[in-house]
Amino acid sequence: MVDARKNAPEQPPAGGWGALNATERQLARQKILVKGNRALLNMNKPGGFDCPSCAWPDPVKPHKAEYCENGAKAVAWEATAKRTGPIFFSEHSVSELRGWSDHALEDQGRLTHPLRYNRDTDRYEAVEWASALSEIGTINRQLDPDRIELYTSGRTSNEAAFLWQLYGRLLGTNNFPDCSDMCHATTTTALPESIGVGKGTVTLEDWEACDCLFIIGQNPGTNSPRMLALLHDMAKRGVPIITFNPLKERALVKFTDPQSPMEMLTGRGQAITSNYYQLRIGGDIVAMQALCKVVIEADDAARVRGDARIVDTAFIEEHTHGFAAFADYCRSLDWNEIERFTALTRAQLNQAAEIYMRSKRVIACWGMGITQHRNGGDAMQQIMNLLLLRGNIGKLGAGACPVRGHSNVQGDRTVGINKTPTEPFLQRLDRAFGFTAPRKWGHDTAECCEAILRGEVDAFLAMGGNFFRAIPDTERVSAKVQHLKLTVYVATKLNRSHLTPGEHSYILPALGRTEIDMQAEGQQTVTVEDSFAMVHGSTGQLKPASEHCRSEPWIIAQLAKGSVADRAAIDWDALVADYARIRDKIEAVIPGFDSYNARIAQPGGFHLPIAARQRKWDTPTGKANFLFAAGMMDEDDDVPERPHYQLMTIRSHDQFNTTIYSYNDRYRGVAGERMVVFMNQDDMARESLTEGDLITFRAVAQDGLERQVSGFKVVAYDIPSGCCAAYYPETNALLPLSHRDVRSNTPAAKSVPVQIVAQSAGTPVESAPEVSEQTPEAAGLISPLA
């Protein structure tokens, strides 16, 4: 059901009672109403556990309830009372389970036993830990390490990720496809070219001092809801919040703070965005350059008049390189072209630039609306150019803020999950563990998929995640997995990737972030790094889902003992008995972790050093660089004369990555379904479509392969003409592996060229998800909250 009234201007604010009700409903669905609410009071606080959802930082003084709606859903999903044990797998074949929806698979509950796939029965069967580990080790020892892939999910702790990279390098490979390859790897690769570091430069203290905020290609209401509390406070004190985003997102329009009694009583909420610019998909590069053009030309005029300069000349002269060439390029840009490629008017862009020029301390945020483009790195560098013009970096209240979407995705990279390790890192690793790590660069996610397609992979080992559902070209790649000799999935819940077994396949049940991790020397704490480079501890509070679940560090240690015990004199049992020993090794290998164990004992943890915060630039020029690609105007200019739309793939509000909590998207007025396409009304008229019509997407790709998915229901929405949006992972099959950012190989999932074809009555719906009989919606027990 889609209620168009929910998309109207008078729609209620985000947050408020809707968020509280949705939280309690999810806890009830997972049968942990009391237990779950008690656990939430310990989340994101010293001595408690870190949210397993997004990577937003914790405040110095936490609220009594320091969690958001979607963080609570993640906890409910992990701490559920439901279980997926051996009896379930004896009743359902893998072939049958492939017909289930993503939601239904995970909604069966927590995995309770190690499992081994039986090809004869087409079922997973319980297996003893010792047998599974021995068999995996035997197979791994026989393989060429260049044909082994080790995947890492973003919620993996620092301790587990460090052991995982150590295990992989002892095997002899740098093949480390990582979930960040599908989201913020663009930040990690492009930002260092500008400022010498691949992380954000701001802290929460900067947010409190900021006098202007830019939000570009991000939807915090769904992806980082705790960020809304800061946006709420900033808007309340009159800070201009400038949003560039194709879709009008409700949480960026108005938000009711659930922790404000007055707002909860009145339901009025706080307006968030002061200026909302709905630019065309792929228009970010030109939009940012247009703002720079206005600033530079205003500075030119001020210089001629003898007035105070608009750009920060002292900062530019001392700290930057390439300004003159960039300024000349911006001056040359034509406003007719700018308006055509951005779908914004000159007046709108002038307005945004005027606000920027009046402000003294500006923060710019971005999400995957920037990183998931073919030229995402170039777009990000234009954001940096805008900040550099007025010295908005390395001072209080200003800087760059990439908002990462998974709890420890930044930390995993920091501790060594990297296909291209530096020589200094490898030398420190060699000294710390007494072996010689491989120097040959490995695979990222896209390269791993390409290697699978070429038949060059024998083993795929996944530390969490849902790799074969999250990737582009899902159908092509997944079809090849059956030919792999080995697949190993460390997981908390059943998901679609587990239904693509290799010749030998295992599912190993892991503890979740919320659960007590008891090892030989007592209860353990793990650490994570948030989006602001703050490292802090996380200590589970709940009883494990099963006596057979094991911690990720323990699982890795046992895998290593079975595969690489003879390659270095490492006491794996001692490392796992007390994770402080793992942290000692991290301190020895990774710069910035001095006194690691002592500092995580402090409430809130510690910040890793970010050189650009001190205006130190680790770049070839020794300065921050103005970078641009001349003539790069459009995301879409390589498919001329082929009429198509630009599709952006998005999350629903009841979704975290490939995890689907329900079929509702409250903030967009959708309830009980996911197979929808959000379209501009003029485009609907052009295609002779009306609300509720079914369409087929056909990808417009350069490789000549046919990609299409069917059964999407048309929904009229506030989105620029020529653009449309639909949920992933249902649309991932449309995305070619080759359609990706040129630096990072991040899939260009926010700008997929597609044709929209109306389905005639009776056309079969190929991809519509089935609602499991076990879901409350299907049983009629709970009305979808809209």
Q: Residue ranges of each PLM-predicted region?
A:
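Long, structured ligand/cofactor-binding scaffold of large enzymes
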Residues: 52, 124-212
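Cys/His-rich metal-chelating microdomains
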Residues: 57
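Short, flexible, mixed-charge glycine/proline-rich loop motifs
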Residues: 39-45
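Low-complexity, highly charged intrinsically disordered N-terminal segments
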Residues: 76-123, 133
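Non-catalytic alpha/beta scaffold blocks inside enzyme catalytic domains
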Residues: 106, 115, 185-385, 389-395, ...
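Short Cys/His-rich Zn2+-coordinating modules
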Residues: 28-38
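Long, low-complexity segments enriched in small/aliphatic residues
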Residues: 573-665
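Short cysteine-rich clusters marking metal-coordination/redox-active sites
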Residues: 48-54
